[in-house]
From Swiss-Prot:
Residues 48-73 are annotated as: Disordered. Essential for DNA synthesis. This is Gene 30 protein. It comes from Bacillus phage SP01 (Bacteriophage SP01). Residues 51-73 have a biased composition (Basic and acidic residues).
Length: 225
């Protein structure tokens, strides 16, 4: 269903702002028009539906500030995580493989969020060498075994499962949650979490990697580490 003409909220600069979707650029990005008439192309993750079709208007700052201790709650800063994706809206050349990462990474984060609620930070185990790496090895070994079974004809490949998916019964489809895709997702999340461990525990090393590998023309668009 087309979303053109839909009232929405778009993440602009560092806040959500009322806007209207004026065009769809494939499945990954849209162009919006703000109330001041300016237009901007955004990845879909930076656009959200407005409740009842009316975006929440960002309140203007006033010159009168509440006194400290008056019981005013600290304002909630929205979009902090999205700031790390703002660089995408500054690039002039869209690269297909890179663009496809957004929905997948978002899904991986949702899976990890749910599992963390049950298992906590069990992926760390006893640390880098006795916890994180053994867990990654275990996930890779599972994926490697599944691949070997496919090659030997002991298990169906993803292509075979895809072609027969519509004819599967509900029990067969339910069993797919333990498929090779699950192994790939687990391995991907463990590696991503390893990067967060490095960033938290070895910030100087992480920053050195960041400055060496993230190109200058995109690095400037990131919030300060």
């Amino acid at each position: 269903m087309s979303r053109i003409g839909q009232v929405c909220e778009a993440f602009r600069e560092n806040h959500w702002e009322p806007a209207t979707i004026i065009s769809e650029n494939g499945s990954l990005s849209v162009t919006v028009r703000y109330e001041d008439g300016e237009t901007e192309e955004l990845i879909s993750n930076l656009v959200r539906n407005s409740e009842l079709g009316h975006p929440e208007v960002k309140k203007e700052e006033t010159t009168q500030q509440p006194e400290k201790g008056e019981g005013m709650a600290e304002p909630k800063i929205e979009g902090t995580c999205l700031d790390h994706f703002r660089w995408y809206n500054t690039i002039t050349e869209k690269r297909p493989d890179n663009s496809k990462l957004f929905p997948v990474v978002s899904a991986l984060m949702a899976v990890q969020y749910d599992k963390e609620g049950t298992y906590g930070s069990s992926w760390v185990g006893k640390g880098e060498h006795r916890g994180i790496m053994p867990n990654i090895d275990r996930k890779y070994d599972r994926l490697d075994t599944m691949t070997a079974n496919e090659i030997e004809g002991k298990a169906k490949t993803l292509a075979q499962l895809e072609s027969s998916f519509d004819s599967m019964n509900s029990n067969e489809k339910e069993a797919l949650h333990e498929s090779k895709i699950d192994a790939v997702a687990d391995l991907a999340n463990y590696c991503l979490l390893y990067m967060t461990f490095i960033k938290d525990n070895f910030p100087k090393m992480y920053n050195a990697w960041f400055e060496k590998n993230v190109p200058q023309y995109l690095r400037d668009k990131f919030p300060r580490l």
